[in-house]
């Protein structure tokens, strides 16, 4: 039925108007630019993707899409993300017919600010072609949309002539351009080499034309590009297809495209990878990297989440992950199958659907490990979501105990299952999975939900029971997190102290506050601490980094932590892997799987199952692939001794050669590295860097191979790109600005500096590999700085940290009606007296004083140093003074790990819910030889019952733990009259 094709001549003018926003809307180019997702229930067991076909039964042109759905599962056809004007009306129309009468659903889908917004309309579909329409006003804040067609009926749906246009009604259909083209490959990844590329083009007009096309492949991150030209004879109303050979020799994230005088082809994105060894890795013998979840068995509102196929069978999906370097996958119960369905009644277990999933994973080259507990240890008491109700009812039928809410857990209450139920669940699960699963992690982030002692009891039961069920299994435990501001160090140390290490084969951690070597707590420093625990309590226990979704540099954290928290640059992933491997970690699975794949919307990180688009490995996946390519089977030889600002590790590969990985800690402070001819250098993705004698080293690691690398990589091989760098500026008080300079050489450097808007000339000497702060008088909130380091004059516009509150030694201060305090500096102590008014005493969680009524002190002994670091570091101390809680916990004084609380004198007097007291902190307890000017803040936390109601802060707010730049300042001298 081709009656619309006959209208082509009549709408020739409309073809050039661009009214239709959808590319390949007539589907003459197959599914190019579009995505198809189909769900396959676990009981199916085959986990195969829908084979989309082109049908000659069409409305427009020669083809339509044919979507066969023999099992009646969900099938979704998705457009690419299309820019739209918020506040305007848009009409989505598409011609549909079906092999049997059914109902389809048209929808507008927008991923905005971390949420999915979907508005749908159901339409009847018959055996005859019918145009279906959906009109929607685009809400404010939705600059792009995806339109979708979906159905859940057995049978075949045909789709053709889709159109998205501005306005409140559908106009006559017209393609988005007179000529359209696309380039595609069979997979979204390949190894480097010459590869076949499919080129398709369609001419919607009536006249034949010979069109010169330029087909390209480019890697935006490396600057590589290749091009092939071809002339194509396009008959009127015809589609042509050609196979061409392209040399895809540059590894990384590559985009295939084509252009001609009047247009551009629909691009095809893929990853070009290094070829990796086949077969499974052994986490007990070699370093392994991996991800959290397979990503394609997501929550679909059912107890047994189905396979959500993205144009690829599950076996192919796992093959793709392995090609990117994934050798282990951390699996959760919500991906495997809901615990209340696996264990619906005491003594009853149903593993049939789970086994189909485990069988499929076991056939792959990837080793699974399962995190046990997700829904057994927390419930949502108020949610009406059917899944939450099912969890709640399932748990309460087991007579377990509800606990008090813990910090970081939103809308959830931690619970304690009966140990007999926990024991039965572990035994049945491990016995069933024996031979297919060897590794089990006991609980995800238990420090958010229970004390170390309680956790250790569940860990011991799981360990003993699992070993009886499968003597070959391995137990991973602890799994403490620093996310949500949680304290991981104390939990891990307490668990180790009470004997938890006797009941695990590896202990895992989530280092959210120590993600990189540029973090406030450098990654290697945290690993030193964890390795010390391991050495003290059980040296043979392995270290596993099982989750770290936010691997941010300092600049990344400022830009993306709130708006796009899972933002990831490929160099940061490589750095994390190298640090983990070099410091003795055995397994590193920091990422969620979709962090290794291209985003299909510019607005947020969203997994491709929501868009139905193919999963395309991104630059981070290519960087991971290169890491595994160079260091598979290698042994770490240790951290290299390099100049400040440069980091790196040395490894011996399986064939006995040396490989070093080096990088600059921060992009703004690069180094030149002189390279001898006999040294081979490779970029982040494994591409050789040829004919480079002097390399500018930045945050992107490079791989070096050759002999005597440790001898070559000495301080003399590195020259700073910038001798003196300005790290930052901060107002000390109104009219007085501190600017910090960093010397990146091995020699002291004399410096002359002034502000451009006038004022004094300042002179100082910046010590070798050190920093110095200089103060200027200015009222300008963003002055321009000029400085001379002996070689040349430089300038920079400053963006200082603004003034916070200030006080003098001995001054009394009131914060609202709730808090009054004074702080005095004596030769021996910093003395703080305080009085807090409280209406009602609240409860608190053991080990988490900030969850109840308490007084917090924040001290920064170097407020004008490290001005490129807002996160609290070694100079920042946090102290808690806590009265008796409503749930019976005693008064106590505690503090951050770097604070020796045993040296601090304190007193506390309680009068009903009010409390007052005095704290005397010896200067040596905070690393000072005597009185000095401090960054300072004080907060009175107010809780009632189990809720933290408010905080009363002098200078900052409840984010002080994440930014020292919120602190005020306390001056040494008394207030001048």
Where are these regions (language model features)?
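Structural preference for beta-rich elements and adjacent junctions enriched in aromatics
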Residues: 60-61, 171, 777-977
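Aromatic- and carboxylate-lined catalytic core of secreted/periplasmic carbohydrate-active enzymes
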Residues: 574-671, 684-688, 698-719
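Extracellular and organelle-lumenal recognition/adhesion modules and their flexible linkers in secreted
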Residues: 13-243, 247-248, 253, 257, ...
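An acidic-aromatic substrate-binding cleft motif
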Residues: 269-327
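Catalytic-core region of carbohydrate-active enzymes that cleave or remodel glycosidic bonds
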Residues: 514-595
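Carbohydrate-binding surface patches
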Residues: 198-202, 207-211, 641-678, 684, ...
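Substrate-binding cleft and catalytic face of glycoside hydrolase catalytic domains
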Residues: 324-504, 510-514
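Extracellular beta-strand elements of beta-rich domains used
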Residues: 27, 94, 134, 160-164, ...
